[in-house]
Curated annotation (Swiss-Prot):
Organism from which the protein derives: Fusobacterium nucleatum subsp. nucleatum (strain ATCC 25586 / DSM 15643 / BCRC 10681 / CIP 101130 / JCM 8532 / KCTC 2640 / LMG 13131 / VPI 4355)
Binding locations of Mg(2+): D455, D461, E464, E465
E.C. number: 6.1.1.20
Predominant subcellular localization, coarse grouping: cytoplasm
Keywords from the named record: Aminoacyl-tRNA synthetase, ATP-binding, Cytoplasm, Ligase, Magnesium, Metal-binding, Nucleotide-binding, Protein biosynthesis, RNA-binding, tRNA-binding
One GO process term, biological-process aspect: phenylalanyl-tRNA aminoacylation
SUBUNIT field: Tetramer of two alpha and two beta subunits.
Protein name: Phenylalanine--tRNA ligase beta subunit
Keyword Mitochondrion: no
Ranges of residues in domain FDX-ACB: 705-797
Domain (tRNA-binding): residue spans on this chain: 39-148
Gene assigned in the entry: pheT
Matches recorded under PROSITE patterns: B5, FDX_ACB, TRBD
Coiled coil spans: none
């Protein structure tokens, strides 16, 4: 948003320097992005008067002039324009002037006659691209005065970054309010005077709002017998300061008022209207040629202003050529309206029309200020274009908005901003912001923001206003007074990170999948009624919420194998979902789980070791390592009955009666279903939510024993259905000297009975306090052998 300092000074007294004003604007939230000092290109450009007028002696097309510029002697200047005469007041660029485009004025000789300057046109001064002749000034223009001073071009333009919640600041009066509030000054609003005729507007035109959802207020006035012409210099100066080119006095006034009050408006040629005006939705494929010369077809019911025959404007966005103001216009209809912001935003983007009008309307206007804006525009049009203002105003007001009422507690405000402001201090700040105050007692007040501040709806908004105007620089920085107590990180948040770190140490790669899986998996994996189905799934592949990570990890393996990546060990940590059923009112439970899947061969890329296929014990080892690192030791393994797993190579992990996980080789039929050939898959899933209560947070450390270990190997024959893990736990309970037992071989085959299996293990014995004697070792081994024989019917292999 461009703001002219000269224009701003019309509404508020400003004594501060440019830098001080820029800093103040930034501190109150209207950030200054750039400052443009205008008139720099108009040094040595002054007002002069033609005091002698002769033809050039050597050219019929040139004139030889003497021009009084306030010096001791008139300047001799040669001119090629045709629109000047004796005694005209003109704009003179003296020797040394540098005009826009780096055009330097020097002493020159034209057709053997010297010239000491140049008479300027608007194009040569950079005001327009083309001009028909030089600038002719009014008779009262003071000779010798700098042209930029005369035209009020000694201006400073601030470019501001206005936030979307402050559309009121897209105007000079809006910024004047902000500056006045900051410096505790008053805003000087424009004086408005209108002389009306006896003739009523109701005899000329009527207005009907057909689409009341998108147009909440529409006002109109008629001015007859206007004279459309070039705008006066003061008006052109204001329009140019905003980066626009003047068009004519009527259009320029509508733009002037928009930049003054931030209220877009439009003027129609009344004689080009056919009947009355209706605000309605566009008809299917209705056509309109807009002011930018583009033929547009309206297909989506855009809101339009229409007469009885045609659309004459796209409401709040752009006018139509069929009713535009031109030099022949005599009677005009002036509109100002409130269109809903969401409608303007939608229309502007659909049609690709981004005008100043649309930019403002889509941010929301002050609907209660329309009558004031209309009066201001009509009074200015009558001033610069003459004409007769018809009596009465068309004002169709569909719905008056309800202003917010905010209860403000002084104690809470002071606590928030870190100050101890009094009731009167806060009241003064808010009053300068046009916020109405009603005391409620006990340090509380009821606040009603002005109609142009729709962004103020709650106490926090008021806190911001008080801080802005009190000044951020006036609030001292303080170190918060607080007691800091160290605390432990919540294990619920810490758990996934710990598990992720452990599995990455083991060389597993993490994957992330969607929480939704296809509906057919319900039958494939025998999920039963525990599945939660999505009523409106994005696709068939995302129809149910997964109760297990199994499907996702299998598809990860399949997709990698299809890309010739077969040696894989993956894991995923994510939530699963389970329906508790009708007994629990259809409630669902979420469990955090970790899934692990192995495929192919272990990557031992060493010269002295060959790759080996992953097996049941690799997976079991990963789980044991994970549980050990989590300090979970009191768990047991039992045979798993699950159709998704190989019946002879799967187990479930239990702590007491809680099943915290399952693992094993996936059933070959399931693997084949996914088109995975010649590969065994090993899958494990741990319920981390259940596991949480068994994790030991505190770890006890002990020193490494300085006494030597004793290693004994043992091979035994057992019944095939005996779980070796349970047997090892029982042995450790009986023999305190056992430090570790490792299984290094399991065999079942032709060399032993078909109902038997051979298990070979290494047993490490150690005492922490002394060296073991032969008697200690023999006693321990005999106890182990007796337990294996008596309880598990085992035999020692020799």
């Amino acid at each position: 948003m461009l703001i002219s300092l000269n224009w701003l000074k019309q509404y508020v007294d400003i004594k501060e320097s440019i830098d001080e004003i820029a800093n103040a604007l930034t501190m109150i939230g209207q950030e200054v992005e750039a400052i443009d000092i205008q008139g720099k290109d108009l040094d040595n450009v002054v007002i002069g008067q033609i005091v002698e007028f002769d033809k050039h002696p050597n050219s019929d097309r040139l004139t030889l002039l003497k021009v009084n510029v306030g010096g001791e002697e008139p300047l001799q200047i040669i001119c090629g324009a045709k629109n000047h005469k004796l005694n005209d007041k003109v704009v003179v660029a003296k020797i040394g002037a540098v005009l826009p485009g780096n055009f330097k004025i020097k002493k020159s000789k034209i057709r053997d006659v010297e010239s000491y300057g140049m008479l300027c046109s608007e194009a040569e001064l950079g005001f327009t691209k083309e001009s028909e002749g030089i600038i002719i000034l009014p008779e009262d223009a003071p000779i010798g005065t700098e042209y930029r001073e005369y035209m009020n071009l000694n201006d400073v333009i601030f470019e501001l970054e206005i936030t979307p919640n402050r559309p009121d600041c897209l105007s000079h009066i809006g910024i004047a309010r902000e500056v006045a509030a900051y410096y505790n000054r008053k805003v000087k609003y424009p004086m408005i005077e209108i002389t009306e005729t006896i003739e009523s507007i109701n005899t000329m035109v009527k207005v009907d709002i057909e689409d009341k959802d998108r147009c909440k207020r529409y006002m109109g006035r008629v001015i007859k017998n206007v004279k459309v012409q070039e705008s006066p210099d003061w008006l052109k100066s204001r329009i140019r300061a905003m980066g626009l080119n003047p068009i004519n006095n009527i259009v320029d006034i509508t733009n002037f008022v928009m930049f003054e009050y931030n209220q877009p408006m439009h003027a129609f040629d009344l004689d080009k209207l056919e009947g009355n005006i209706t605000i309605r939705a566009a008809k299917k494929n209705e056509e309109i040629t807009t002011l930018d010369g583009v033929d547009r077809v309206l297909k989506n019911g855009e809101l339009v202003i229409a007469d009885d025959e045609k659309a004459i404007a796209i409401a709040g966005v752009i006018g139509g050529q069929n009713t535009q103001i031109d030099n022949e216009t005599k009677n005009i209809f002036v509109e100002v309206a409130y269109f809903t912001p969401e409608n303007i935003r939608k229309t502007s983007r659909e049609l690709g029309i981004f005008t100043d009008s649309a930019y403002r309307n889509e941010r929301g206007m002050d609907v209660e200020n329309l009558s004031n804006v209309m009066a201001r525009a009509v009074s200015l049009i009558a001033e610069v274009a003459g004409g007769d203002v018809l009596s009465e105003v068309i004002d169709k007001y569909v719905e008056k908005p309800q202003r917010a009422e905010i209860s403000l507690n002084l104690e809470k405000l002071n606590k928030f901003i870190g100050k101890n402001l009094t009731y009167d201090e806060v009241g003064k700040i808010l009053t300068h912001l046009d916020i109405e105050l009603k005391p409620l007692g006990e340090g509380t007040m009821l606040l009603i923001p002005p109609s142009y501040r729709a962004d103020l709806t709650r106490p926090a908004d008021i806190y911001e206003e008080v801080i802005r105007m009190y000044g951020f620089d006036n609030i001292e920085a303080k170190i918060p007074v607080m007691s800091i107590e160290s605390g432990e990180e919540n294990i619920n948040f810490k758990m996934p990170r710990i598990v992720r770190g452990i599995l990455k140490e083991l060389g597993l790669n993490e994957v992330i999948n969607y929480s939704f899986i296809p509906k057919f998996t319900k039958e494939l994996f025998n999920f039963g009624d525990e599945v939660i189905e999505i009523k409106n799934p994005l696709s068939e592949d995302m129809a149910i919420m997964r109760p297990t990570l199994l499907y996702s990890l299998i598809t990860n393996i399949r997709d990698n194998i299809n890309r010739n990546q077969t040696d894989l060990k993956l894991f995923e940590i994510s939530k699963t979902f389970k329906n508790l059923g009708a007994e629990k009112d259809g409630l669902a439970i979420e469990d955090l789980k970790v899934g692990i899947i192995l495929s192919g061969r272990e990557d031992k890329n060493l010269w002295n070791q060959s790759k080996t296929d992953y097996n049941f014990y690799d997976l079991k080892g990963y789980l044991e390592f994970l549980l050990e690192r989590l300090n979970v030791t009191k768990y047991s393994l039992t045979r798993l009955e699950n159709s998704n797993f190989h019946p002879g190579a799967s187990a479930e992990i239990k702590i007491g009666e809680d099943i915290i996980g399952v693992f094993g080789e996936l059933h070959p039929n399931l693997v084949n279903y996914f088109g995975i050939k010649r590969e065994k898959l090993f899958f494990a899933e741990l319920n981390l939510t259940k596991l949480l209560k068994y994790i030991k947070i505190k770890v006890n450390y002990e020193s490494i024993s300085k006494y030597p270990e004793v290693l004994r190997d043992l091979a035994i024959t057992l019944d095939r259905d005996i779980l070796v893990g349970d047997m090892i736990k029982e042995i450790k309970k009986k023999v305190a000297l056992i430090e570790k037992i490792d299984i290094f071989d399991v065999y079942s085959g032709d060399k032993i009975d078909k109902d038997k299996k051979s298990v070979a293990m290494s047993i490490i014995l150690r005492d922490k306090n002394r060296t073991l004697t032969d008697g200690d070792i023999d006693t321990a081994m005999n106890t182990i052998l007796e337990l294996i024989k008596d309880k598990y019917n085992g035999e020692i292999r020799k």
